[in-house]
């Protein structure tokens, strides 16, 4: 079994998943991608995750609804959100629930890398933002 951090990327846009997957893998992390929150919930990787990177607005369950669901199940995995439709109310809701960052698409890779590093530091107990 690998000790590499495991990151889930959830977005209904295949090109965003592929681009984000490439960036996160280039940092040396293991990645699983999912086209929806529901597909993610059917996976057997939920308890192994170090971080979830999710689109806010997706068909079916939204990224924020997924975060809330996992919290009700006792899973406090760090979340990074990105969205093409920024909404201050939703951002505040996500951050209040513990989101590490909330990025607007298109986002720059450095912002995602910083958020991911903060999430992984939070996950291993060394801090956060």
Positions of PLM-derived features:
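Receiver (REC) domain active-site loop signature in two-component systems and cognate sites
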Residues: 58
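Active-site beta3 strand of CheY-like receiver
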Residues: 47-53
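Two-component/phosphorelay signaling modules centered on CheY-like receiver
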Residues: 14-32
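C-terminal output helix
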Residues: 89, 107-117
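Acidic catalytic/metal-coordinating carboxylates
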Residues: 35-36, 62-66
